[in-house]
Amino acid sequence: MTSSDMNSNLNRLRSMALGSSSKQSDPHQQQPRASQETLNARLKLRRTPNEEHEPEHYEDLQLDFNPSLFRSLERFLPENLLSSTRIEKARAMSDLLLRYSPESERIRVQKHREYRQNILSSYQRLHEELYTLHPVSFFVPSFLDAVSNTSEENFKSIIGRAAPGIYTFDMLKPQFCQMLIAEVENMEKWFHYSKSSMMRPTTINKFGVVLDDFGLDGMLQKLLGDFISPISQVLFPEVCGTGLDSHHGYAIEYGKYRDTDLGFHVDDSEVTLNVCLGNQFSGGELYFRGVRCDNHVNSEIKENYDYSQVPGQAVLHHGRHRHGARAITAGRLVNLVMWCRSSTFREAKRYQKDFSSWCGGCKLEKHNRQQAAIKATVEVLKRRGADKTHVEH
């Protein structure tokens, strides 16, 4: 679900749930159940959000909807429900979302739940150690040293600013990269032999695996919370809000009989982590063409930066950085990608119109306005000076 879809669903839900006490959910629709006390409390949402209330974090729960939606919706819960436990609130909000979401969305949610349950109940993991974060085993020493003290000086000791909004650093050990590649291959074989259809990571990828669907979401969320979010709050404070709190994690493959390149696009993220896992390959360079907000995503290209991928090396970039991947010319290339999101930034973004702190288009417009204002002021002062001279003579 995109951020715009999430906001429209939230507005629709709010309007339908206000004052509602008689609508019943489809008895054939499986959904989370809350206690009767919670169900009674949640029937009537607030008309305006409680801005003083600090919402819970829901990223670690198995939810059918984006955790960001739960954080936004929580501000509209009645006071007596706000004092309930986090689980009770999550159940009540899940019930509301399932009741009032469009039928197509309910069907999508149900199908994805069944899809994931089928994988988790049948898939035989190849490397069990991948499913729990082991920093010493996964990361190179220089990366661990840099993040042991979350100061800007520490980060910059290993992190290079390749271009505005783009940072590179050594991150993953070769053994981890090879294990993850083998796990991805095992996932694909499982799908092939089970004769199941695979949900691909994005709409522009024909190949690749959503790692979260195979049970790696817990490990990746730990990676986000303990490492990527603290780093990003130093490097990208303008889009991290109070922290990055949810993710979409996947592996993408390039090569013969796979995707050969990746078209020009922006990610549905605040910050994106892209790590080359290997193998032997030629080509596949990443190219970046500037950070833009929604209003300027198709604006003129003035920024140009190309990056040659190195196994184990990470690229951490602004999610709104327009980018793509050039065609691979030989071998096979596998990447670990995490779209990292901030629910607090997305909530605040709804009320913003100017993003000149990070959008090249907004920055140019702001500069042009300032220059026009200076020019107009100079013209006024000139006229006043001319008028004063005329009067004196």
Write out the residue ranges for each language-model feature.
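Fe(II)/2-oxoglutarate
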Residues: M1-P164, W358-N368, K375, E379-H393
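Surface-exposed loop/turn and secondary-structure junction residues enriched for glycine/proline
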Residues: S122, F207, D212-F214, H265-D267, ...
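Generic preference for well-ordered alpha-helical elements
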Residues: Q36, N66, F70, A90-M93, ...
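Generic hydrophobic, helix-prone segments enriched in Leu/Val/Ile
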Residues: R91-L96, R113, V147, F207, ...
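C-terminal "cap" of GNAT-fold acetyltransferases
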Residues: V334-T344, H367-A373, K382-R383
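Catalytic core of non-heme Fe(II) oxygenases with the double-stranded beta-helix
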Residues: S3-L13, L18-H28, T38, R42, ...
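Short, charged low-complexity intrinsically disordered segments located at boundaries
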Residues: V209-Q221, Y257-F264, K366-Q371
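Non-heme Fe(II)/2-oxoglutarate
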Residues: I119, H127, Y131, P135-T242, ...
